[in-house]
Amino acid sequence: MATTGRVLLLSPPSLSSHPEKLNAILKSHTRDKTDLQMLDRLAHGLVSLPESTYDIVLLLTGADNTLAETHSLLNRELIQRVVHSLRPAGKLRNRENKPWGLSDGNGSNANSSRRYNDDEQRFRNEVILAGLVFDDKGELLKPDIGAQQAIPLKLSRRRKEKEKTDTLASSANYSTNGTVGAPSSNGISAPIPAAKTTENNPVPPGVGFIDFSDDFGVPAEDDPQDSDEELIDEDELLDEDDMGRQIVQPPECRPKPGKRRRACKDCSCGLSQKLEAKDKAKRATADKALETMKLGSSELAEVDFTVQGKVGSCGNCSLGDAFRCDGCPYIGLPAFKPGEEVRLLNNDVQL
């Protein structure tokens, strides 16, 4: 089967054990324009296909001369890669070059009435989802989207000028006394009484006005059309029983075990306000506890160790805090020998 353009042969792995069949297939194609790839290597990602390269992709049959093995290996990702390797207007064919018989199922093809297995049905759905379509011959074709061009529609200049002239003439022929001038055969304009205009439509022909009565800027009391409508008070829609009814918390707002309850961003069940009030109460309690721990200037006792001759009354100042009295000036200092000089360096006691 001689073909023009670049051809990609997709072979199932079972065909590799029959080199005589594979060589016979390769002899029917031009070798410099034909590429051969194994479906199992493509499925495992060991090789890749170039995009928009091949005019025809040919699915080869397996060792049993059926496409069952080929269909089982063609998954969704692999089919999309095969479709991307096709050029626009490229075709996906089988080895026998027979119509797929899956285009419409109306009996036009010989194979359209048979029952397909799961792999064939899945293959049909996947190739359609990948972007292939059936042509008139029942072959799978990649549509050429670039060939479709949008043609802008433009009104002719003469038509625009004619419409403008007709509008101006209609406005000019309308007179103030309610008559319309109609040209006669002798060129003299004869007055023709115009149709009586009603109060609902006092608009001359060919002239349009915009009705702003439906705008939101018109107050309700000034709009005669909406004056009879009854206004509903939102507060009357809920009674006391509805206001006192317990709020049902949605499942998504319920906290999971071991986690703190959190409100949604657009919370409408009251959880956000409840958590905010609880946080404020905790913060106020903590601030109040801190205030009780603060000492005033009159409550602070300053111990001056530089004053000479200042000794404790118990005589146990050098033994440590365990032996010192409550008013001992050496509280907080380590034990020392009587008469030893005590120095402070960087707020640390140096004995």
From Swiss-Prot:
Biased composition (Polar residues): 105-114, 167-186
Subunit structure: Monomer. Interacts with TAH18. Interacts with MIA40.
Family: Belongs to the anamorsin family.
Protein function: Component of the cytosolic iron-sulfur (Fe-S) protein assembly (CIA) machinery required for the maturation of extramitochondrial Fe-S proteins. Part of an electron transfer chain functioning in an early step of cytosolic Fe-S biogenesis, facilitating the de novo assembly of a [4Fe-4S] cluster on the scaffold complex CFD1-NBP35. Electrons are transferred to DRE2 from NADPH via the FAD- and FMN-containing protein TAH18.
Note on domains (UniProt): The C-terminal domain binds 2 Fe-S clusters but is otherwise mostly in an intrinsically disordered conformation. The N-terminal domain has structural similarity with S-adenosyl-L-methionine-dependent methyltransferases, but does not bind S-adenosyl-L-methionine. It is required for correct assembly of the 2 Fe-S clusters.
Segments of this protein annotated with the region N-terminal SAM-like domain: 1-151
Organism: Ajellomyces capsulatus (strain NAm1 / WU24) (Darling's disease fungus)
Motif Cx2C motif 2 per record, residues: 325-328
Binding site for [4Fe-4S] cluster: C314, C317, C325, C328
Swiss-Prot/TrEMBL keywords: 2Fe-2S, 4Fe-4S, Cytoplasm, Iron, Iron-sulfur, Metal-binding, Mitochondrion
Region annotation (Linker) ranges: 152-243
Gene Ontology biological-process entries: iron-sulfur cluster assembly
Region (Disordered): 93-118, 157-186
Binding site for [2Fe-2S] cluster: C253, C264, C267, C269
UniProt-recorded name of the protein: Fe-S cluster assembly protein DRE2
Cofactor(s) needed for function: [2Fe-2S] cluster; [4Fe-4S] cluster
Intracellular or extracellular location(s): Cytoplasm; Mitochondrion intermembrane space
Gene Ontology MF, one: metal ion binding
Motif window: Cx2C motif 1: 314-317
One cellular-component annotation, GO: mitochondrial intermembrane space
Region annotated Fe-S binding site B, chain positions: 314-328
